[in-house]
């Protein structure tokens, strides 16, 4: 959810840049909406909480209220699911009802784009921006691939103070480490991660690390890895973000993100923090690592094995092709670009 919404911001920014007088509304689940507070390209965040998503009648009621209160000139249905199509169903007088080509979208969307075509080799941001193309009928579109998050100076200052109290020395680099994942199949081999972190600590004596994890299994996993590393003083295991905006403030106060691909990496890129991420076979790096002005690199099985060889291997074997040596070589190459 975080990654999808983050990459969608480039479309919001493209629309605001192209139509500065337009009012841009962004529809999101409530649990991630706080990230987009204060965004200059988003005039209003419309949220759906659990009680508004279910039962279905409650969802329909909320969609009807939103569409009838706002009477939109343009609806861009980025997901184009049966549920999201109700925005267009209740807005048949809206001149531009834009979305994806699917079998069931023909009747309700009057501009459809194939953002998941097998012929596309573009990243997710570029695919999202295809949805702005029908608006070229109004005026030329000024596209941007930049997606940004905005924190207040006070938010960043408060979290920096907390980090200092926990022992962070801002005279030295601070790495945010995506050491674990919510979904087990997306997590790089734990022993490989331990080997790589040990080598970073050995060869970069000034680097400090903060492990990023959520409560529950992720925290348990992160603390086990910390113990396996020998509980080094340079890893601050107890620095925790209690909300998404605090996670953003944590990212904003770090020098670099390294680790498993996920929402925190997208947040880092949106805050112009450089990164290097490890992509599982189930997450296409070419799609989910968008290129823009921020240094963001990564590694996936596609960088190592040709498709015909991957076709003969199990998921685990493909993931294991990303060895600590390959990760370290590419990580250090990325770090050299920064220095």
Where are these regions (language model features)?
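Catalytic machinery of carbohydrate-active enzymes
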Residues: 1-339
